[in-house]
Amino acid sequence: MGQKVNPCIFRTGPNLPRNWESVLYAKNNYSDFLLKILKIRKIINTEYSFAQITKILIEWPSSKNIVVNIYAKKIGVIIGKSGGDIEKLKQNIAKITSADVSINIREVKKPELEEAFIAQTIAQQLERRQSFKKVMKKAIHASMKQGAKGIKIICSGRLGGVEIARSESYKEGRVPLQTIRADIRYAFAEAITTYGVIGVKVWVYRCDVNQSRINEVK
């Protein structure tokens, strides 16, 4: 019987398409560091949900210093007026970690290729009661237009408010899930609607790992 694995975990590691999103050094208190990292991610995703955050990278080289890199489409929402919101975020993270906090905000230039952005956008549009078919097709068209080699989207739940839940999927291009060298990004989001929760899954195939590394060198 076939077993499903998260495409991101399947491709994370040295010489693979993805790297770890959290890097820390710990001896016996690894679980404490992990719990604090989860709290930091929850604070950022909750307080700045409208910033359309695509990725959060956390580097914790020592107990005294922590670096948080936030990638988002609307960086102004995170920074706030005169940097007031980002200072507040630093204070909240410092309370959790008891360390010196450095925050780097980076703007995503092509959000249509970011799996998290696509999933969040679809979920928000479903909450506004837009047609799930139009929303999914529009997202696929925008992603392919920006250079994606393939994209697959699945929405599950009471689509359109029907009584019986079902799943609808749309796909364009190639999404080779069994090819490890393929740089496939995966994200999941939930749309909280009046008739229930709708799950949104997104797979985006960008390129092969060799091609992506050549582009990084350039």
From Swiss-Prot:
The keyword Cell wall biogenesis/degradation does not apply. Keywords: Ribonucleoprotein, Ribosomal protein, RNA-binding, rRNA-binding. Gene3D superfamilies: 3.30.300.20, Ribosomal protein S3, C-terminal domain (3.30.1140.32). It comes from the Bacteria. NCBIfam families: rpsC_bact. Belongs to the universal ribosomal protein uS3 family. Binds the lower part of the 30S subunit head. Binds mRNA in the 70S ribosome, positioning it for translation. This is Small ribosomal subunit protein uS3. It comes from Orientia tsutsugamushi (strain Boryong) (Rickettsia tsutsugamushi). The lineage of its organism: Bacteria, Pseudomonadati, Pseudomonadota, Alphaproteobacteria, Rickettsiales.
